[in-house]
């Protein structure tokens, strides 16, 4: 689960991290009062969407010359003018895809005198099985380019889970970021605080980009991104209240209600599979034959007829889907249950695109019999390769 920047900063402020004063608004009419409540005279007006690259993004409804999703303002009047242009319009960034995301809220923040921009994130480094700091002196909007072009400028410092962030860890991170003076002193409290927040709130990612050194020498969290482990949300009612479902794919929200592992993708072949490994193999072979999967959908090992039907309806609700491939290896999951669920869903929502079903495992013959006797336009496949060829051929006509 992701949250907005202003929410992430409020959470970090509770852990003692240095953040600027700011106010989130939902309406243009709130912009002037929000700006007046801040010290000024420099303000930053930030689009709040769950995507990076906002500063370099462009609004669909505005001219190409218009400014992006993060703007400086030197007066309250300029803050209001920016709010009028940004709220309600669609921001397209490198991470949103061509569709973009509608900006429904802004964060108006006090400006900062920036001396240096740094990068700092915390994540689980699976290569060593520990939480790690990933840092670079090259922070700001182009961190992706740094990672691609000059990866040697990014350093990783793994943390011993028993010891936590030690003085030696702080020194190593500070050295990697070339901190000295007041910034190095601030680091002694900031990095342990970030680590504590990451662990206590069961985050999957905590990214501060940029972490700035101000002209007075002190550190400040200028932007913050947080992603939480969805499997741990039951422990964090305070975090769950921060969820903004308008920023999420409606199909993924519906899937979560049925405990389905569903991720929307950009392709045109819908996939329904049991087991994450088989799901990834199915997506791979679709790509091998020249098409792209429209989703990752794992119905799990113990799904019943209703859950299978729900998964099928979610897949068919995607207007990009031009064909559907159901690939089931029945172990705990029985092939006849899959067949009954697919048929129930098809009868309810109709079938306007080609459907290929490959079944193998427990009750496979019964499952095939149910499909064959359904009278529906369902194409059977003998194996995964055959299934992929058939669904691609059906789409290509």
Swiss-Prot record:
Pathway: Carbohydrate metabolism; tricarboxylic acid cycle; succinate from succinyl-CoA (ligase route): step 1/1. Binds 1 Mg(2+) ion per subunit. Its EC number is 6.2.1.5. Mg(2+) binds at residues 209, 223. Residues 9-254 form the ATP-grasp domain. The keyword Hydrolase does not apply. Coiled coil: none annotated. Keywords: ATP-binding, Ligase, Magnesium, Metal-binding, Nucleotide-binding, Tricarboxylic acid cycle. PROSITE patterns: ATP_GRASP (PS50975), SUCCINYL_COA_LIG_3 (PS01217). Succinyl-CoA synthetase functions in the citric acid cycle (TCA), coupling the hydrolysis of succinyl-CoA to the synthesis of either ATP or GTP and thus represents the only step of substrate-level phosphorylation in the TCA. The beta subunit provides nucleotide specificity of the enzyme and binds the substrate succinate, while the binding sites for coenzyme A and phosphate are found in the alpha subunit. This is Succinate--CoA ligase [ADP-forming] subunit beta. It comes from Rhizobium leguminosarum bv. trifolii (strain WSM2304). The gene is sucC.
């Amino acid at each position: 689960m992701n949250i907005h920047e202003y929410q992430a900063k409020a959470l970090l402020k509770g852990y003692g991290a240095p953040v600027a004063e700011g106010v989130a608004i939902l309406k243009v009419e709130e912009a002037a009062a929000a700006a007046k409540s801040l010290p000024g005279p420099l303000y930053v007006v930030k689009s709040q969407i769950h995507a990076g690259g906002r500063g370099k993004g462009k609004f669909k409804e505005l001219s190409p010359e218009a400014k992006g999703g993060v703007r400086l303002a030197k007066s309250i009047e300029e803050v209001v003018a920016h709010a009028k242009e940004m709220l309600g319009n669609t921001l397209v960034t490198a991470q949103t895809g061509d569709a973009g995301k509608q900006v429904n809220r802004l964060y108006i923040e006090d400006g900062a005198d920036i001396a240096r921009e740094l990068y700092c994130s915390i994540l689980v480094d699976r290569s060593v099985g520990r939480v790690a700091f990933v840092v670079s002196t090259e922070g700001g909007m182009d961190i992706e380019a740094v990672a691609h072009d000059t990866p040697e400028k990014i350093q990783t410092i793994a943390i011993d889970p028993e010891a936590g962030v030690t003085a030696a860890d702080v020194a190593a991170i500070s050295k990697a970021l070339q901190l000295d003076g007041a910034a190095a002193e601030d680091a002694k409290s900031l990095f342990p605080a970030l680590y504590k927040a990451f662990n206590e709130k069961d985050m999957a990612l905590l990214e501060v980009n940029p972490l700035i050194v101000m002209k007075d020498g002190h550190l400040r969290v200028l932007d913050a991104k947080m992603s939480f482990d969805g499997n741990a949300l039951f422990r964090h009612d305070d975090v769950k209240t921060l969820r903004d479902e308008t920023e999420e794919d409606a199909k993924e929200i519906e899937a979560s209600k049925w405990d389905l592992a569903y991720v929307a993708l950009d392709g045109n072949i819908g996939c329904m599979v049991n087991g994450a490994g088989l799901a990834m193999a199915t997506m791979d072979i679709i790509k091998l034959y020249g098409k792209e999967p429209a989703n990752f959908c794992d119905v799990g090992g113990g799904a019943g007829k209703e859950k299978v039907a729900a998964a099928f309806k979610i897949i068919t609700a995607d207007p990009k889907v031009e064909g559907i491939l159901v690939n089931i290896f029945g172990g705990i999951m029985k092939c006849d249950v899959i067949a009954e669920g697919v048929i129930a869903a098809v009868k309810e929502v109709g079938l306007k695109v080609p459907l290929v079903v490959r079944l193998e495992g427990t009750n496979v013959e019964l499952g095939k019999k149910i499909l064959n006797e359904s009278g529906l336009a369902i194409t059977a496949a003998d194996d995964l390769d055959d299934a992929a060829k058939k669904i691609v051929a059906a789409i290509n006509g």
